[in-house]
Each structure stands twice: as structure tokens, then as C-alpha cells.
């Protein structure tokens, strides 16, 4: 054989070996993922999940696990809809980056150029804020600050934007990262100012349709009518319960999209191919790059098994280093669902995990398990590790809750007659709340959540054990303030899943 022929054979052999290595499926994915997932469904009281893995432009795995609804019979498949929550944010950021690329706006435009009524409590910050500030969470708010006021409320989008001016920012402008859903709403509301199209119409026409995401819904109001969909669930009093659909179209650009892993695989393939799908440029590569440019510093990227070196936020994406690779990802959580979408551009790898409870860490555990499998890291059994954390926390909370219920059962005396706590209360951000006697119970009724109430049971003195009619808002202890024998106010705190900050209501 001539040297030239031998060299050709050698090159072809090396190429075949390289391609085979590129397309090889890790043993965890090939042999263990199904067992791992089905076991996790039981351990996490998780009715159903859907998973998709994309490698080198091809779908390696795409399937559903478990059931759409607890105690049901319909199985999750690759076309079953889940509400994807804050994974909607990357769509909003991408839409605005597209408009920036088309020179129809600049991401450095001041927000007030497009929404003159936009204001913040810090007047100068409101005047100086640019579109990028909205998309990278650097307005100065604490994470989730203000969300109780907005979340599943009857406020309009315009009213949500107006309410932002009443929030006392926790940090100076642009000094700290704080996850702000209302900021993404504001960014999304710039789109109709520029294009004449509502946010939901723009992303459908410019993103969903070109990608062939024909099963994807932009608004939560359309979810209940979908045929192939999951029901929302949570864990309440240690048990799995079905909960109402989440209506958050007043925050739509921050989190109202519903999709399937099949549809989302097209979004992920396009992202991994710098805006192209099936050879066609759907999103300009410059717009994709804009969203992955670091804007906010979160920390050093610490991980339970792997010390990271940075954790940042782009525009609608978290950016971090893991095992020497740049990870582009986001998670999403709305009532009854938690989801994750992960890109590893250097490995041409994409991972999608959707689940239909909002009280599980499996959606993140499986992501890390798949990442480790493809990156050659040892198997960690993240689900078991996270279960340990969750079990410890749940046991602690259950003990505290039982102690509170035991106290209620003793019928301790309140400092004042129950009628003294009734009346009209006001918070400058939230607005109006009333405490009333109804069905022989003391209840709180919130003006912007007319379908929800909080039941108050005496713990003695001026403290009350509170349980919300909507399990998402959880349970708490509310202390009333009393001066000179009169009730002057109350501190209201909902579940951290909704907001970390307490609200001080003053009695009128």
C-alpha cells in the first residue's frame, strides 16, 4: 500500500473514531436513566416528568415518565405540555435582542424612552434604568421582592409596572443582583411600543412559528383548554395534592409560557446552533450572543461537588462554569411545576427536564447527573443527596407546624376580643386587605387575590397561626401590633416560593 493510501486510511479511521466518540451515549443515559427517573418519581411524590437530551444536533433521548395527574391513568409523553415558568425569560430577552439587532431599539435605551410612566422609588434609578437593567435583574431589588403583590393577582400589566414605584429597593441601583419578575414584564411591554404587537403575538410569530413550536402556548389562560397537558401539584402537609392552574398573564414575559420537551428541543437545537435550525437562520447569531454576554455577578459559582469559578447572569440566562465548561441555563417555577433548560455550547449538549410538582429537586438533580455523564465526571446520585436535604428540612418544618397546631388546639386566649382584629388594613405596595369574621372563622381577604383567603387561628396574645386557602402561599405565624389596647397593624409573610419579604399592613 502506498504511503498516500495508508495516510488516507489512517485519516478516515481517526475521523470515524472521533465521530464515534462524539456520538457515544454515556452508560448512565443508555442503561440507568429510566430506572433512576422512575425511582425518583416515587421518592419525590412526583406524578410525572419529561426529559430530552440533545447532543451534536441530534435528539439522544426524548420521552415522558409517569402520569399527567396524580391518581390518573394518562401517561406523560414527549408532547405533553408543562408550564415552564421562568424559562420564558430567555424568549423575552431573545425577542428584545432581535429588535436590537434590527436597530428598532437599543438595549441601552432608557426604559422611559419606551414606557414614560416607568418609575422607581429611587427617582434617579428610574430615570437612568436601561433595557439591559430589566433583563439582568440589577434594579436594586431583592430576589422576588414585590411578587406577592403581583403573583396570581388581579392586577393588569400596567398596574404591575406602576406598583414597582412603591417598592423600597433593598440595594443601591446596579450594585446587587436581585431576581425581579416585574422587570421582565416591563421589558416585554416595550415590544408592543416598538412593533405594535403584543409580547405574546411577537414571540409566537417571530420565534414559535419559525421554529415549528406549534404545541407551545404563550399565555397561561390558554393552558386549561389544552388537550395533552399535565395538571399542577404541590406537597402540602407532607402529601401530594392537586392545585389550581396558575394564572400569571399579568407577568407573562417573565413566566407564562407552556411547552413540551418536543417543542423545546427545537428551541434548544437552535440555541446550540447559534440561531439556526434545519439550515435556516431563525434568530440572528448576534442576538443569541447578546443574551449570553455576562451582565450581573451572582457569586463564585460554588457547587456541592465541584468548586466553580464564576456565576453570572446574562439576559434571561444564568451563566456559570462547571467542570471547565461554560453552562448556559435557567430554571422555571410556577404553581405546580418546576423545570430546567441547560445548554453546554462547547459540548453541543442540551438538557431539558420538566416536572409537574413545584416541590421537588429532581428536575435539577437529573440535569447534573446527565451533565456529569457527558463530561466524564463520577456518578453522584444527586437525587439522593437532594432528598436528604429536603427530608431534613421537611421534618424540621413538620415539627414546627405540629407544635403550632398543638398550641391552637389548646384554644389560647388572645389579648383582645377577636372582633378587635377585624377591619380594613393597608400596605403601600400591596394595597388593601380586610380581616373579617366569616363562617365562624377569622379570615384575611386580599384585594388583589379575591379568590384566596387566609384563615387565622389564635396562638395566644396577638399571634395567629395562618393557613392560606391556596397551598402555594403555605402557612405562617402573623403577629398583630397592639398599642394602648388597640390593633394598629399586622405583619404578613407568605411562602418563600412566592416572596421572601414580609409586608407591614397598617390598620385604618
Regions found by a protein language model. Give the residues of each.
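A broadly conserved amphipathic alpha-helix scaffold signal in soluble, globular proteins
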Residues: 11, 15, 136, 188-192, ...
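Active-site-proximal loop and beta-strand segments within enzyme catalytic domains
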Residues: 28, 38, 43, 67-181, ...
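Short acidic alpha-helix initiation/capping motifs at coil-to-helix transition points
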Residues: 181-182, 362
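Residue-level micro-sites within transmembrane alpha helices that shape
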Residues: 3-4, 17, 88, 136, ...
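Catalytic loop of the DD-peptidase/beta-lactamase superfamily, centered on the K-T-G motif
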Residues: 22-63, 192-205, 209, 235, ...
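Bacterial Sec-dependent N-terminal signal peptides
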Residues: 1-24
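Short glycine-rich, polar/acidic loop-and-turn segments at beta strand-coil junctions
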Residues: 13, 53-55, 65-67, 88
Amino acid at each position: 500500500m502506498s504511503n498516500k493510501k495508508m495516510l488516507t486510511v489512517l485519516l478516515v479511521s481517526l475521523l470515524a473514531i472521533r465521530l464515534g466518540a462524539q456520538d457515544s451515549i454515556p452508560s448512565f443515559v443508555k442503561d440507568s436513566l429510566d430506572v433512576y427517573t422512575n425511582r425518583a418519581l416515587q421518592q419525590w411524590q412526583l406524578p410525572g416528568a419529561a426529559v430530552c437530551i440533545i447532543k451534536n444536533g441530534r435528539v439522544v433521548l426524548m420521552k415522558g415518565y409517569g402520569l399527567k395527574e396524580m391518581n390518573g391513568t394518562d401517561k406523560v409523553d414527549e408532547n405533553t405540555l408543562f408550564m415552564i415558568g421562568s424559562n420564558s425569560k430567555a424568549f423575552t430577552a431573545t425577542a428584545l435582542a432581535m429588535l436590537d439587532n434590527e436597530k428598532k431599539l437599543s438595549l441601552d435605551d432608557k426604559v422611559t424612552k419606551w414606557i414614560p410612566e416607568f418609575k422607581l422609588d429611587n427617582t434617579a434609578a428610574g430615570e437612568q434604568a436601561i433595557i439591559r437593567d430589566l433583563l439582568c435583574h440589577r434594579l436594586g431589588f431583592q430576589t422576588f421582592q414585590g411578587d406577592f403583590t403581583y403573583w396570581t393577582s388581579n392586577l393588569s400589566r400596567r398596574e404591575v409596572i406602576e406598583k414597582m414605584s412603591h417598592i423600597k429597593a433593598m440595594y443601591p441601583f446596579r450594585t446587587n443582583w436581585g431576581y425581579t419578575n416585574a422587570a421582565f414584564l416591563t421589558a416585554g411591554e416595550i415590544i408592543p411600543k416598538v412593533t405594535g404587537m403584543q409580547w405574546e403575538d411577537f414571540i409566537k410569530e417571530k420565534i414559535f412559528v419559525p421554529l415549528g413550536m406549534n404545541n407551545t402556548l404563550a399565555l397561561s389562560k390558554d393552558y386549561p383548554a389544552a388537550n395533552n397537558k399535565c395538571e399542577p401539584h404541590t406537597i402540602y402537609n407532607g402529601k401530594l395534592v392537586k392545585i389550581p392552574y396558575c394564572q400569571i398573564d399579568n407577568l407573562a414575559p417573565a413566566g407564562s409560557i407552556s411547552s413540551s420537551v418536543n417543542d423545546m428541543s427545537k428551541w434548544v437545537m437552535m440555541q446550540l446552533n447559534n440561531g439556526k435550525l434545519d439550515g435556516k437562520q431563525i434568530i440572528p447569531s448576534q442576538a443569541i450572543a447578546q443574551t449570553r454576554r455576562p451582565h450581573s455577578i451572582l457569586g463564585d459559582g460554588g457547587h456541592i461537588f465541584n468548586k466553580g469559578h464564576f456565576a453570572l447572569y446574562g439576559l434571561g440566562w444564568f451563566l456559570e462554569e462547571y467542570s471547565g465548561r461554560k453552562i448556559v441555563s435557567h430554571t422555571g417555577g410556577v404553581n405546580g411545576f418546576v423545570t430546567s433548560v441547560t445548554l453546554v455550547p462547547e459540548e453541543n449538549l442540551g438538557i431539558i427536564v420538566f416536572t409537574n410538582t413545584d416541590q421537588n429537586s429532581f428536575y435539577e438533580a437529573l440535569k447534573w447527573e446527565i451533565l456529569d455523564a457527558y463530561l466524564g465526571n463520577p456518578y453522584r446520585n444527586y437525587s439522593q443527596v437532594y432528598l436528604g436535604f429536603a427530608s431534613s428540612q421537611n421534618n424540621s418544618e413538620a415539627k414546627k407546624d405540629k407544635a403550632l397546631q398543638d398550641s391552637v388546639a389548646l384554644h389560647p386566649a388572645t389579648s383582645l376580643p377577636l372582633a378587635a382584629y377585624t377591619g380594613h388594613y393597608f400596605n403601600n405596595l400591596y394595597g388593601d386587605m380586610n380581616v373579617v369574621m366569616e363562617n365562624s372563622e377569622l379570615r384575611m381577604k386580599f384585594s388583589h387575590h379575591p379568590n384566596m383567603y387566609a384563615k387565622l387561628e389564635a396562638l395566644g396574645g396577638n399571634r395567629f397561626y395562618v393557613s392560606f386557602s391556596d397551598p402555594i402561599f403555605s402557612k405562617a405565624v402573623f403577629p398583630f401590633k397592639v398599642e394602648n389596647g388597640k390593633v394598629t397593624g399586622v405583619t404578613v409573610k407568605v411562602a418563600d416560593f412566592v416572596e421572601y419579604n414580609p409586608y407591614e399592613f397598617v390598620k385604618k
